A protein has these predicted regions:
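Structural helix-adjacent loops and short alpha-helical linkers that scaffold large soluble proteins
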Residues: 120-132, 175-182, 231-235
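Structured all-alpha helical bundle cores of eukaryotic regulatory proteins
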Residues: 150-153, 158-161, 181, 188, ...
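Flexible glycine/proline-rich, aromatic-decorated loop/lid segments
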Residues: 187-196
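Terminal-appendage/accessory-domain detector
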Residues: 1-104, 203-217, 224-458
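Hydrophobic alpha-helical hairpins/lids featuring a short glycine-rich hinge
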Residues: 91-144
């Protein structure tokens, strides 16, 4: 790669993306790419019967008709743009999509777009894997430098860093040269948007999942503009009014230091549970507690949950009086109360947030900042749970890493169990088995139809 000092940030990222080749990817990055691809598809299949997903499919069919790319879980084909948008929203809906400790949720903004465009253009599995890996690297160059400021300002990364990374993914799939990839990235900067107000208004809006769709659509649009010859600002990232300044606290060349040396996709994590990733360590710590002994829930005096700052703030993460399933999926008091009662945290468990047995425990929960766990963040994302009974018995559970993190990765059997749970009933059993096997073979396919045909309902 050319010396970073001779390039601005846009050029440097575009140069890396345009020159990345499949053979440059380490085996772990290829393995994770296969898992990310199948995981994203199965997350979408699991959401197939929900109201929002049906609405998205109807909207995409009306506004983006075509025969280029499959709407997963259906026998409908749409334009590549329509399928990418709808599949992105759908794969995000259950909140079981992948989760990187620093970059956040990445796959929903990149994988549906890459698959739709590769399907449209008859590209191979190796090309798909390489494009997705490049998109993760873009995310990794952009998101960490603004992450803290985003959280303080209530901004959402999916349609911000997600839009920029999607622009590069689209440009690569469209075969654009380095200069046009750079322009796609630069043009997408002014399309980046999105807040987390949807959490406070959960149940009253659909924005959480639409943000992934916005990223896909805007990223693709930016690439189309670049392909047509439009130019974006060279300082779109590191300029005085560029992205790092607008969404963060300014540019630091160290933001780009890992490009070409570290592959972000190899560091991503996966969600074995539903709901927000920041509550998952609480799920695992509670299950760790239950493995050591089941407290009599009718005799619980108090429950204490200790975690890191990002897991306990802002206020919706410690909300006691949730009005909707969407709010409940972010609430630590609800999480620990549900898992103590049910032992799991899937969509059907979160939906039980208002049951009497759960609500009996919620007021007894105290959420605190655990100083040691907070000091370890973001290298670790742990949680500690304590349950004290009226007789003084103490039950404790602790994890240093949520299940699915690189240091506590799901086993192949656990991955397959998740995939089967999500895809069950959406596609034939033989297709589910073949899709599970795609984790290790997706790079070997010659045409994207070999993958997307497995998502058909029959």
């Amino acid at each position: 790669m050319v010396d970073m000092k001779s390039m601005n940030a846009v050029e440097y990222i575009a140069d890396h993306a345009s020159n990345l080749e499949y053979d440059m990817l380490p085996p772990l990055a290829v393995k994770r790419a296969g898992q990310v691809i199948v995981d994203t598809i199965c997350c979408a299949l699991g959401a197939r019967d929900t109201h929002l997903v049906k609405l998205a499919g109807e909207f995409a069919a009306a506004t983006e008709p075509g025969s280029e790319s499959v709407l997963w879980g259906t026998d409908t084909k749409l334009s590549a743009a329509g399928a990418a948008w709808a599949n992105a929203l759908t794969s995000k809906h259950l909140e079981m999509d992948d989760s990187h400790r620093v970059c956040g949720h990445v796959a929903a903004e990149l994988v549906p777009l890459a698959i739709a465009l590769c399907e449209q253009r008859g590209m191979s599995g190796k090309e798909l894997v390489t494009i997705i890996a490049a998109g993760y690297d873009v995310f990794g160059a952009i998101q960490p430098g603004v992450k803290v400021a985003q959280r303080e300002r209530g901004l959402d990364h999916k349609s911000q860093a997600g839009t920029l990374a999607s622009a590069v993914v689209a440009a690569l799939a469209m075969g654009l040269d380095t200069n046009k990839i750079a322009n796609a990235l630069a043009l997408s900067m002014d399309m980046a948007s999105g807040t987390e107000q949807y959490v406070f208004d959960a149940g009253l809006c659909d924005t959480k999942d639409l943000l992934s769709g916005y990223a896909v659509r805007n990223g693709m649009y930016a690439a189309q503009l670049a392909e047509a010859g439009f130019q974006g600002p060279p300082g779109a990232l590191d300029g005085e009014y560029g992205y790092y300044h607008a969404f963060g606290d300014g540019y630091d060349p160290d933001f780009l230091a890992g490009i070409g040396k570290e592959f972000v996709i190899a560091e991503t994590g996966f969600k074995p549970h539903a709901g927000c990733r920041h509550v998952h360590a609480c799920v695992d710590a509670t299950n760790n507690l239950l493995e050591q002994g089941q407290p009599d829930l009718s005799q619980v005096e108090k429950i204490k949950v200790g975690s890191y700052k990002n897991a306990i703030t802002p206020s919706f993460r410690v909300k006691y009086d949730c009005d909707s399933v969407n709010q409940a999926g972010f609430s630590l008091p609800v999480t620990v109360s549900v898992v103590l009662n049910r032992g799991s945290w899937y969509k059907e468990d979160i939906a039980a947030f208002d049951q009497a047995a759960v609500q009996e425990l919620v007021p007894k929960v105290e959420v605190v900042l655990d100083e040691q766990i907070n000091a370890d963040w973001p290298e670790k994302n742990g949680c500690r749970v304590e349950v004290t009974t009226k007789s003084g018995d103490l039950f404790e559970g602790h994890v240093s890493y949520a299940l699915g993190e690189p240091e506590n990765m799901l086993s192949d059997a656990e991955f397959e169990a998740k995939f089967r749970y999500l895809a069950n009933g959406a596609i034939p059993e033989d297709n589910i088995t073949a899709l599970c096997n795609m984790v290790d073979t997706v790079a070997d396919i010659n045409d994207m139809s070999e993958l997307v045909n497995l998502t058909l309902p029959k």
